[in-house]
């Protein structure tokens, strides 16, 4: 990805200081999603490393990962799998507990959403500490999926999430980096 595209995408992301608490800068992609050119470029760049590769499913993490993941799945002619918070899916699920910055939560997916051996890419808007992405990777592997990559619009490298995923053998692709929290 060229520097102009990186700059354009970074400029389309709103930064909100002291949200949700003092000292945090919230990176809001709703402005990127609302800008047709930036949204298209972001999706094109998320898809680029996988062009020409058979990817069976895109797993999008609640909630912004649903928006981006659906678009990525469409472009790659892949199926889409929502990974949701506990209690949000109506059929038989598989579930895993995962670590958050300040506690533990659970995520789940339909048990039959991915078949053993299928190649899956994780998609979300942002990787920070990596708790959600690591949990999703473990959940998918628990049912036999091959997690071949993870892509995010934003990386907050100071928080170490990318490194945690890479330590699990997941190739990580991001578009924009922001320092700090």
Swiss-Prot record:
Keyword annotations from UniProtKB, A to Z: Cytoplasm, Glycosyltransferase, Purine salvage, Transferase
Keyword Transferase: yes
GO terms classed as biological process: adenine salvage; AMP salvage; purine ribonucleoside salvage
Enzyme class: transferase
Pathway given in the UniProt record: Purine metabolism; AMP biosynthesis via salvage pathway; AMP from adenine: step 1/1
Superkingdom in the source lineage: Bacteria
Subcellular localization: Cytoplasm
PANTHER family referenced in this protein's UniProt entry, alphabetically: ADENINE PHOSPHORIBOSYLTRANSFERASE (PTHR32315:SF3)
The family this protein is said to belong to: Belongs to the purine/pyrimidine phosphoribosyltransferase family.
Protein's name in the database: Adenine phosphoribosyltransferase
Primary gene name: apt
